[in-house]
Every structure is written in C-alpha cells, then in structure tokens.
A protein has these predicted regions:
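Active-site-proximal helix/loop segments of hydrolytic enzymes
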Residues: 2-26, 31-115
Length: 115
C-alpha cells in the first residue's frame, strides 16, 4: 500500500527505478543496454517527480543482485526494471513492445501491469 506523502491529500507510490546494469550487451548502433536504459531513466525522472511519485534509483555501476537487495531493503511500493530484450535471429525485427513480469499472486502487481 502506498505511503502518505507529507503535504499531499492523496496517496502516491514510492518507486524503485532499476535501469539495466548490463554494459556487456552492446547495441547494434551505439552504446549498450546500461547506457540506453539509464538514459531512459534520466528522462523519466522529471515526469515521475512532477507526478508526485517518490523515486529511488539503483546504482548503475552495481550488479543486478545488488539492485534487487537495495530495492528490497528500501521497501518501495513498486520495482520498475528497465531492460531491453533481444530476439532470436528467426524473429529479428518482428518483436516489439514491452514485457511485464509480476508475482502471479500479487493483485497490486497485476494492476500495475495493466496500467
């Protein structure tokens, strides 16, 4: 359940924003997954803050395991991992869109996946 933010009359979520730490996944054009997903997170931050959402970010130089530990320790309402997916050669250029993963027993996770 979201935590009441001081000075607000509605409840706003606390978000752990976790862009990829995978520098070893190069992109075809330039850069790598860590670079581009962190650039995306940088662009998202002003919009999230303007919406009243409190955001904590992972350490881009850390590991995925450290990001998970930090997220769990911070007790955020929602963990948003930003990653890009590769396709097998047979499906190159055919897959688009986003994937949402959540615990099957999490009603809140299902609600967030359907937003």
């Amino acid at each position: 359940m979201p935590i009441m933010q001081e000075g607000r009359d509605k409840r706003m979520p606390f978000l752990f924003l976790s862009p990829s730490t995978q520098y070893f996944n190069p992109y075809v054009t330039t850069g790598d997954e860590r670079y581009w997903m962190n650039a995306l997170a940088d662009e998202m931050m002003p919009y999230l803050h303007a919406s009243g959402i409190t955001v904590t970010r992972n350490d881009p130089d850390g590991s995925a395991a450290q990001s998970i530990r930090d997220s769990n320790a911070s007790r955020q309402d929602f963990h948003l991992a930003l990653h890009s997916n590769a396709a097998p050669q047979a499906l190159a250029g055919q897959l688009r869109g986003v994937d949402f993963d959540y615990y099957p027993t999490s009603e809140a996770g299902l609600r967030m996946a359907n937003i």
